[in-house]
Amino acid sequence: MPGNNLSRAEAADRSAHLRIHNYEVTLDVTTGDNTFYSKSKVTFACSKPGYSTFIDAVGKRLISATLNGKSIDSSEFTGQSLFLKDLQAENELVVEVEAIYSKTGEGLQRSVDPVDNEVYLYSQGETAFIRNMYPCFDQPDLKATFDFTVIAPSHWEVISNNPVKNKSVVDGKNKWEFTRTPVMSTYITAVVAGPYAHVHDEYNGKKKIPMGIYCRKSLFQHLDAEEIFNVTKQGFEYFERVFGLAYAFEKYDQIAVVDFNWGAMENAGCVTFREELLVFRSKVTERMYNARANTILHEMAHMWFGNLVTMKWWDDLWLNESFAEWSSYLALVEATRFKNSWAGFNAERKNWAYRQDQLSSTHPIAADMVDIETVKANFDGITYAKGASVLHQLVAHVGRENFISGLQVYFA
């Protein structure tokens, strides 16, 4: 069995034999400062009865596991994976682990606000970190539906990919149950929890989309929600029209999170942002407003390209990211006040790609992603900006109208 470094060959083998139906994920984040309770009930099919494989599961210890009603011995748990023997045509797997909060932004991150000592949680799944939050087959092509339940302190908010179905009080804590998600990859599932301050609006386009913006209570006074909502609405109107397809998910929340390694993350309906990119604590330049709008639109573009349609394996990471990069600049110019954004792309983003291309670590745009560690090394200017530049050239070559028509056929 692998550790955390899943190989392409291992992923392909699982994909050839498994089809995942649904996950019922239960998290209890009231059990301590270092660990939390995590349970996955997974239903899935296997095309080759008798086949053996593994599920990704990272934790301090295995509490219990059953496969089709039979207990799995704890010796089958490595701390990163759980071995599964003799699968049937249809299977039900239940795994409970004592999972570990992340301090590095991978999995379920736990941070403490120094202003008021309040605790804030958020998940980060890309590339293969969601296994740190709940047991799953953590690869992009093994999609499924998800039912999330979270037990949290009574004064907290809890946000996930889908709207809340039911909220109840259990032993002085709140139990949040969310509606079932559409079919999606594990890496874009999300849970965010804590005493977040929030504000809400709605976009009315091809359908009504409830929208929320969340941040730490101590930052809320700095949140310019009107500007963020305005860019978000402009993005929805533009992408729904250009892509020819309504937004596929049920809501759209944007959350500023602390100690974040990335600029933002396109979790379906639950987008997380580095705080300083979304919330400005002081007066900033127009360039910063442009950068924020670009990030908002980049993540929104992923709702179609990446979340709705998804790469089979991380070999196509470049297309996932370069398409969102190209789309965000197109939307900036054609749907927002930032009409000169292509000049910024040429001056900044392409130069980023030029610099990276001159290093000994340069690589083809479409890199050979043999395993997860290789993928991690390729979130760079070549994957994003050089790839977007090539797409921009392609659009110029085939013609914008032809390219957009092809996209609409693809999404349909």
Regions found by a protein language model. Give the residues of each.
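Hydrophobic alpha-helical and helix-loop surface patches within well-folded domains
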Residues: 178, 213-412
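Acidic/His-enriched low-complexity segments
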Residues: 1-250, 379-381, 396-398
